[in-house]
Each structure stands twice: as C-alpha cells, then as structure tokens.
Amino acid sequence: LHGIGMGGMDALKGRYLDNGMLDFLIKEREAGRIRNLGFSYHGDIEVYDYLLSRHDEIKWDFVQIQLNYVDWKHAKETNARNTDAEYLYGELHKRGIPSIIMEPLLGGRLSKLNDNLVARLKQRRPESSVASWAFRFAGSFPDILTVLSGMTYMEHLQDNLRTYSPLEPLTDEEMDFLEDTAQLMLKYPTIPCNDCKYCMPCPYGLDIPCLLYTSPSPRDRS
C-alpha cells in the first residue's frame, strides 16, 4: 500500500478500510495471490500507529520507512511533517516486522554535503565515499529487508556493491560520529526539500524542486 499516512485517517478509511480493500488484500494473500503485504509510510503518525496496532491481526510482512542518519533523531528539522526514524524503526523492530528503507541519502543531500562535512568524513575513512556512510548507517540495524537506492550512474552501483558486499556495520563510535555530523549539518541554513516531487505537477507549471535547488538560499551547500 503506497503513500500511507498522506491525508490522515480519513484517507486511510476511504481508500482501504471502509470499502473493504484491506480485508480483500489479506484474503488474496491467504489465497497465495499476494506474497507479501506491507505499506510505505509518509506523514501522519496516527495512521502509522493505528496500522501497527493491528499487526497481530493483519500480520504485516514489511513496512517501508524513511531512515537516514539525519532523520534518525532530527526528522522534524528537515521536514515538519516527518517523524524520527528512531521511533518508526523501533516500533517495527519490537514487533519483528522487516523494514524497507527509503531515502537513505535524504533525497541525495547526504551525498552532497558541504566541503567541511565532506572533509570530516574523508578524514575518518579516506577511501570511502560520502554516500557510503549513509548506506552503512541504513544497513546496520537488525530486520532490514532492503535499502532502496536511486542509482543514476554505473559508479553509483559499483560504490553500493563495495558498501554492501559485504556490509561493514557501523560501530557504536561511528554511530555517535554520524550523529555529531547530522547536528553539524543542521547548523547550516537549508531549504527542507528532499526532491521527492510530491508537490508536482505544479498548477502554475513551475518545476518547484529545481527552483528550490537553484535558489540563492542554500539548500545543500554552505
């Protein structure tokens, strides 16, 4: 179920509950026509908590959440509607529900850090890419089913293969290091846009993410 949480409980009831759609999908899974039933979460935490409260009944096979080393503790500082990934993941982990991770690079922002933060990461691991830190973070927790990655070039694929084959989980000290990095990143003025394009198409024909990215106000740069 895609985009669960957008529109709140009213949207959930209208799309999946009141019309019997969720019950139908559960029966289709029982019949073997659906292998895995899950949802991707965006937005309203009331919806997230409600669906997880029914896990014993529904038995979710997976849930897709936004998780990265900034959103882990600072989600609302990047987007006011978001919830800390520490909470989202924690609620899944305690129920034994596998997680699919989206936005491990926070819309690419964690691969395009300013020069000071790049130098900070490179000083620690000169041979590793900036993006690999975020991918290692996303893969370091138990019950992670997969980590999504939007790869544009062959170099991105090769870097991901180096990161995950095999994965070297972050140490506790490296976790603290990335938390400090996140706090430093948030000190720089940014426009909270992840280039998700949910604001598109614009009724006025504007390319909103592109305009924000090229704005004189800093977004990912300092």
Model-inferred region functions:
Residues Y213-S222:
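Single conserved hydrophobic/aromatic residue that forms the stacking wall/gate
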